[in-house]
Amino acid sequence: FSQIRFPDNNQPWALNMARTIRRYREDYSWNPINVKYNDFSLQAGLLNGIKNVNPPIRLSFMPYASIYAESYDKQTTFPYNYGIDLKYGINESFTLDMTLIPDFGQVASDAMVLNLSPFEVKYEEKRQFFNEGTELFNKGRDMFYSRRLQDDLLNGSKITGRTKNGLGIAILNAITNETEENPLANYNIMILDQSLDNGSFISLMNTNKMQNGDSKNANVTGIFSRINNKENSHAYVAELKMSQEFDKDNYIKGYAGKLAVGKTSGNYQYDLYSIIEDDKYNSNDVGFLYSNNEITNGLVVRYQQFNENKRFINFSSSVAVVHQSLFTEQKFVDLEIEFENRATLKNYTTISLKADFNPYEKYDYYEAR
């Protein structure tokens, strides 16, 4: 209750609740959902009458101290840590979170992975500070990977919220201490996200890493938009990103972009998209990108039977065609055709069938040779 943002005046809240009965493959919701439309969040009900609520000041803090016993080469040391976490509700729209000299020693460790690929492993984020209130940053996809803020974190702070006019703002800043491998570094991530009618939005995001001394600095800027038509039957997506890497001797600039259009309602739906990354685009200083220098074009066509008929309770079928090539060299990489069918029978048994087909041999330019 003390952490919920209550406005001063009466404001309708969007709300929906759902229950899944697994044995019947059925979902029930408080507010009716038209399954012919993909965006369920736009079909929430309205909760009215929330007014005259006087919550306490949204302020909480948690100091902590920890000590460890470490034994190595017949020597035992007792390193210790201390710090504080703070959360403050600036107003009804925005919240400030801060952590000073955090200790993540109680966070579950990562599972061991035998990685034989040419790319690094992307691990799940388990630290609470980087999981709460960071949903807006996910719109940047490869631009932000919180596990980059890993080595000896000195402090972190973030401000998140959305104004009454639908402008979402999220700012995160963190400083990591100097280690034997890396210098002192400052990380900054910022996003502005304006909600539009019919679930549309336009966003501007920037990530920045500044390191002490002559080490490389990096900056990535991206603009993202999704426009839904009035009937929410079609969606149009556009993205443009620019990366910059610079030190005292070099300056590298790269670009990436995406265009997509899709039919998002009805029995027949489709997605048509094109993704381009040049050979100099690199978001890995703050984000996570497996590889650049790629062109990916794809088409997905789906048929979905929503109403029960004589044979099936529901049925879906899709075919996807994806073509990949290198951007700079204009060389073929792969052509994949994927078929997928899924049906729920009258006895509630669900059957699925999936098949992949590559008419040409795939050429992996990253494999060890």
How should each PLM-predicted stretch be described?
Residues R22-Y24, E70-Y72, F94-D97, D103-A108, ...:
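Flexible loop/turn segments at secondary-structure boundaries
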Residues N155, I171-N173, N186-N188, Q194, ...:
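Polar/charged side chains located within well-ordered beta-strands of beta-rich proteins
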Residues F1-Q194, S200-L204:
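Structural preference for beta-rich elements and adjacent junctions enriched in aromatics
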Residues S60, Y64, G83-I84, G156-K158, ...:
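Membrane-embedded beta-strand positions in outer-membrane beta-barrel channels/transporters
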Residues M17-R19, P63-I67, L100-P102, I171-N173, ...:
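Transmembrane beta-barrel strands of outer-membrane/channel proteins
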Residues E178-E181, A185-Y187, D197-L259, D278:
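Beta-propeller domains
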Residues I57, T76-Y82, D151-N155, P183-N188, ...:
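Residues that define the transmembrane beta-barrel architecture of outer-membrane proteins
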Residues D152, T160, E231, A235-R369:
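Exposed, low-structure sequence patches enriched in small/polar residues
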